[in-house]
Amino acid sequence: MVVFLLNLIKGALQRELDQFFQVLSPGDVAKRVVTKSAFCAARQKLNPSAFIELNRHLVRRWYHDAPVRRWRGLDLRAIDGSTLRLPDTPEAIASFGQMFPAHSDPATLARISQVYDPLNGLILDAIIAPYQRDERALLVEHLAALEAGSLRLLDCGYPAFWVFAALQTRKLGWCARVALDTWSVVRDFVAAGRDDAVVTLIPHGEAQAACRSRGLPTTAIPVRLIRVLLPSGTVEILMTSLLDRDDHPAEAFAPLYHLRWAQEENYKCFKCRVEVENWSGKSSLTIRQDFHAKVFTLNLTAVLTRTAQQQVDEHHRGDSHPKQVNLTHALCAMKGTLVRLLTRSDPLDLLRALIDVFARTVEPVRPRRLYPRRKGLHGYHMAYKPCS
């Protein structure tokens, strides 16, 4: 059951089951071993927390055994939220809620949030919650997965005095983009034309009430403001808890915050390559199973591609363009192969062969290429699953 759900389920459920058992017992024609109705009944007994624990174990082993990339000695933790489209079923609507656009039909959505390591490509923690939950509240739920000695990268939707107070109380550092007109200290900083300054955030009125309602202190917080000029000419202001200019010079923060873009790319991969919105069931339970199962499989693929990338870096050293493993191909190769990896008593040879395939499928990296961002919706219908 667990291995089947980890196998990047995207097609018609009965076809996926037949192919799964064909991998376990190869033959010319896939045999009918388990019916979809039997599977649907059995999966009701599977707690989605099984996949959460698998992911936690994978992450712990990676950071214990592997060479970990850090930024100036700090682990980076990018936190961001998004939404997922869900089946329009009564149970999904009751569990997750809907968005009501002004000029279109209601959409059944879930709010998701991730703690992502942009340097090592791993999702450390993932939450799927009702659409009405806001990203700041989900950030608080992530705090148990955040450790001292790490730095949070936050988008402009997170800054609030109570959020910084919660991080400060737990001695967790941060770097966040802030809107130019939200904070008086930011407006004064911009008006003065300064590039780098330490200022003090003092809570007033609503900010104090928000802290008290959450049991947080209302003491003033010293922060550092840094002006960043983008190639487009746009000015961004970063607010950080890293006050020491010698350890963390101002010019280091633009490249630092740009690293957060890796999380946006991870969300794109999660939605478009892994097809997390292509659900295998319609209930709240099956949605949570699919979500956390695909988080684990994406993470496992990232771990294997990192290992393959070490071979690529060595083999292509001196090339005019650096090369990187093609993650889309790696995810395709994991389909079916993952079943063999997780069911064999000694999968080491298969693991080596898989990593070798990853290392042979690479693409050149050409930095500073810019393309317009196109937003579009590509939905999945429960009754129209792909044949593959």
In which residue ranges do the predicted regions lie?
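P-loop NTPase switch module centered on the Walker A-proximal segment
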Residues: 70
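A short, well-structured juxtamembrane/interface segment
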Residues: 59-67, 137
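Single, function-defining residue in the core of a domain
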Residues: 1-17, 32, 43-46, 53-55, ...
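Short, basic interhelical loop/turn and adjoining N-cap
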Residues: 24-40
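Short hydrophobic/aromatic segments of transmembrane alpha-helices and their interfaces
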Residues: 22, 67, 250-251
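Short alpha-helical "recognition helix" segments of helix-turn-helix
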Residues: 18-24
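A short structural micro-motif
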Residues: 26-27, 46-49, 61, 276
